[in-house]
């Protein structure tokens, strides 16, 4: 029986590395923890075949058969990618999975996604703090020359590190209810303050056997490459879970974030 497919997606600096480390503690889960090219490859196949002249020439008279060939091939590619895991479930991490959720469910209807969330000001603060530690190296998209407000503004642009996944998150209410039911939203703040309860609830939602993690004794996986991101987005693992540093954000930047993304705070961080 093929393993259950679990995608990890969501916002940057929102605990996806920690989540994958915690998922890997479960004996029935195979989780390598690295960002995976699987989603990018499936999107690339769709783009490539949609422009292929041989494929297009078949659509007029044999659309159903040709489309079935493509669906079977993409389904087989995903299954083949995950088949060697040898566990009940396999985890694949890519920030683009939320953007591609309907494509994923078309070829793997039982797939589920875990969407990582964090206060947007703290996400910006985490990125800015790491930039100050590595200020002699530019970002991969050349944001070092901006002032702090300008850099924050650029990070939230629709094609940048924070803005791009936010667009996918903003589109979630437009998805059919059946699709939304395949999504689990996990706040970083809850994960680091209540890790045992969070993971127990998550394992149950995934339909896996109960398992209690030990936050003070965590096994570590193979480290992910940080140089590809110019050392701006580190993927550190630790053997013990500790509360993260709180980042002090300039009030002007925090106010701008909360004003521009009111929907985010209303949906995921409502006032109690």
Where are these regions (language model features)?
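PAPS-dependent sulfotransferase catalytic core
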Residues: 1-75, 221-224, 235
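PAPS/PAP-binding and catalytic site of the sulfotransferase fold
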Residues: 15-29, 104-108, 128, 185-210
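Glycine-rich phosphate-binding loop used to anchor ATP phosphates in small-molecule kinases
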Residues: 70-103
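Short beta-strand segments
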Residues: 8-10, 90-93, 115-117, 185-187
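Conserved phosphate-donor/acceptor-positioning beta-strand/loop module used by diverse small-molecule
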Residues: 93-94, 104-130
């Amino acid at each position: 029986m093929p393993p259950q497919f679990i995608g990890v997606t969501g916002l940057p600096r929102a605990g996806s590395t920690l989540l994958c480390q915690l998922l890997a503690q479960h004996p029935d889960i195979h989780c390598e923890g690295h960002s995976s090219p699987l989603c990018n490859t499936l999107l690339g196949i769709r783009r490539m075949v949609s422009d292929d002249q041989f494929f297009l020439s078949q659509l007029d008279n044999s659309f159903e058969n040709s489309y079935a060939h493509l669906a079977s091939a993409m389904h087989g590619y995903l299954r083949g990618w995950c088949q060697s895991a040898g566990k009940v479930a396999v985890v694949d991490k890519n920030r683009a999975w939320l953007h591609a959720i309907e494509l994923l469910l078309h070829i793997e209807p039982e797939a589920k996604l875990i969407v990582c969330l964090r206060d947007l000001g703290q996400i910006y603060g985490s990125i800015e703090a790491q930039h100050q530690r590595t200020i002699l190296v530019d970002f991969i998209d050349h944001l070092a020359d901006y002032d702090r407000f300008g850099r924050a503004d650029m990070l939230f642009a629709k094609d940048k590190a924070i803005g791009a996944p936010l667009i996918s998150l903003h589109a979630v209410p437009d998805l059919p209810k059946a699709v939304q039911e395949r999504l689990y939203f996990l706040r970083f703040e809850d994960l680091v303050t209540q890790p045992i309860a969070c993971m127990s609830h998550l394992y149950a939602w995934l339909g896996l056997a109960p398992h209690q993690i030990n936050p003070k004794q965590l096994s570590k996986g193979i480290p992910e490459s940080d140089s590809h991101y110019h050392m701006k987005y580190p993927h550190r693992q630790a053997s013990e879970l500790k509360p993260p540093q709180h980042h002090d954000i300039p009030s002007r930047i925090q106010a701008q974030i909360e004003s521009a993304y009111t929907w985010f705070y209303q949906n995921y961080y409502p006032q109690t």
